A protein has these predicted regions:
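Catalytic-face loop-and-helix region of soluble metabolic enzyme cores
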Residues: 100-175
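Distinct, well-ordered alpha-helical segments
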Residues: 19-26, 81-85, 116-122, 139-141
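A non-catalytic, amphipathic alpha-helix used as a structural packing/dimerization or gating element
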Residues: 38-60, 64, 87-94, 162-169, ...
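A structural motif
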Residues: 5, 65-66, 125, 144
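Alpha-helix-loop-beta-strand connector modules within alpha/beta enzyme cores
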Residues: 1-6, 81-105, 140-145
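Histidine/lysine/aspartate-rich catalytic loop segments that bind and position anionic ligands
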Residues: 34, 74-75, 134, 141
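Glycine-rich, proline-tolerant flexible connector loops at the mouths of alpha/beta enzymes
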Residues: 12, 65-85
Length: 175
């Protein structure tokens, strides 16, 4: 159902995050089944299959009114940096390129990734979502695309003054 005069965001999990859930059959908490990393060929084949189905899902969302797509890689932080090219950068770049080929902007959220700058330079999203463990001043200095997020959700349940203080801090940094 398309909403007239309303912008909507389509959401997909990144191939790596979906694979993590498939391996663990639940939220991995802070680790992933170590034995799985022994077969790099298998991992890459599964990531390609996931990517293929995500493209179908993305296209369906766009055809049904999504004006932007956000790719969540909730478990990017589980990997070591040496594994980013195969498991994070390449599959996500393929999806970003696909979304852009449909003339739709794309936001990426590589949660807890250790190098947001490198991610943005390689994957080239239109915007990036950051998690609250990231120093916003470092992001502001190093990333030249729109940034969203970064505020610890726990701030939302504190008093109004603390919430206002944290929001103003972010506004000052990103102005």
């Amino acid at each position: 159902m398309q909403l007239k005069n309303k912008n909507t965001i389509g959401f997909v999990g990144a191939p790596w995050t979906l694979l993590v859930y498939m391996i663990n059959q639940q939220s991995p908490k802070k680790n992933v089944e170590k034995n799985f990393f022994e077969d790099d060929y298998l991992i890459n084949r599964i990531l390609l299959i996931i990517e293929k189905f995500l493209k179908i899902h993305i296209k369906n969302q766009i055809e049904n009114g999504a004006n932007v797509i956000q790719i969540f890689d909730s478990w990017a932080g589980l990997l070591e940096e040496k594994d980013y090219p195969n498991y994070i950068y390449t599959p996500t770049l393929n999806l970003v390129n696909y979304v852009k080929s449909l003339n739709v902007p794309v936001i990426c959220f590589p949660r807890e990734i250790k190098n947001y700058k490198e991610f943005c330079e390689i994957v080239k999203p239109d915007a990036v979502n950051i998690d609250y463990n990231v120093d916003p001043s470092m992001i502001c200095k190093n990333i030249k695309i729109p940034v969203q997020g970064g505020l610890d959700p726990k701030v939302l349940i504190t008093d109004k003054e603390n919430l206002k203080k944290q929001v103003l801090k972010y506004l000052d940094i990103f102005r």
